[in-house]
Amino acid sequence: MLALAGRIVTFEPDRPDLADGVLYVGDGKIVGVSKRTEKPPSEFADVKPIEVDGVLYPGLIDLHSHILYNLRTLWAPGGRTEPYTSHNQWPDADTYSQEITAPARVWSKSPAAREVLAYAEAKAIAGGTTAIQGAPGTSKPYEGFLVRNVDNETFGTGEDKVSQSALTLVLDELKKRAQKMRDGDTFVYHLAEGTGPKLLDEFHDVDDAHCLSERLVAIHCTALG
């Protein structure tokens, strides 16, 4: 059980924001919201609220995004009319490197990288998202930005417990990720993206590496259907 104290934005027209409120969470669900001066739910009588020193917003959780790419308009490969059947295909498009890969690489390594990422996160907030997955791979400390970054979540330990890969990993690397999951990490993996039959091999590799667990967050998986 968890109790969070701070300014609470309700987004309910018949219920004003709470300047000093407490939000109660149990079993992964919001149990109640009230003023700090009000009596808590009975099961939270001995739970001390955690001071967030900020504002608590309701919001969407986006578990699949590419934040830096969100700076650009939607990319479309010129001249192609047939849909792709595998995530291994579109990187070979003539304009992909110039219009997608190169700009993202420049943005992530520029002196203004933090500002660039903040702008992309502001776009997410405008759409109602308050937690997002898909932060660029970097050693720079982005945690604590406008939107909660799932990839960089430390859960208060100071240690990154979430790893991710948008690229297909070989079996030996998957086995390393499986060991990290057994040690308590979470692994976000782009898996079997497309409809081509060969993509099923990616799922078999994940299975053979013993990565199928509750700590695997598998994205796409369209070839499994």
For each of these PLM feature ranges, what is it?
Residues 128-217, 223:
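Metal-coordinating catalytic core of metallo-dependent amide/deamination hydrolases
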Residues 34, 65, 71, 133-137:
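Glycine-rich, histidine-containing beta strand-loop boundary motifs that form or position
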Residues 1-45, 54:
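N-terminal metal-binding scaffold of metallo-dependent hydrolase/deaminase domains
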Residues 9, 66-68, 137-138, 192:
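Catalytic metal-binding/acid-base residues of hydrolase active sites
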Residues 35, 71-74, 145-146:
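Short, solvent-exposed loop/turn and secondary-structure capping segments
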Residues 6, 23, 28, 53, ...:
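Divalent metal-coordination and catalytic microenvironments
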Residues 2, 59-61, 187:
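Residue-level marker for buried hydrophobic side chains located in beta-strands
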Residues 54-122:
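Metal-associated gating/positioning segment near the N- to mid-region
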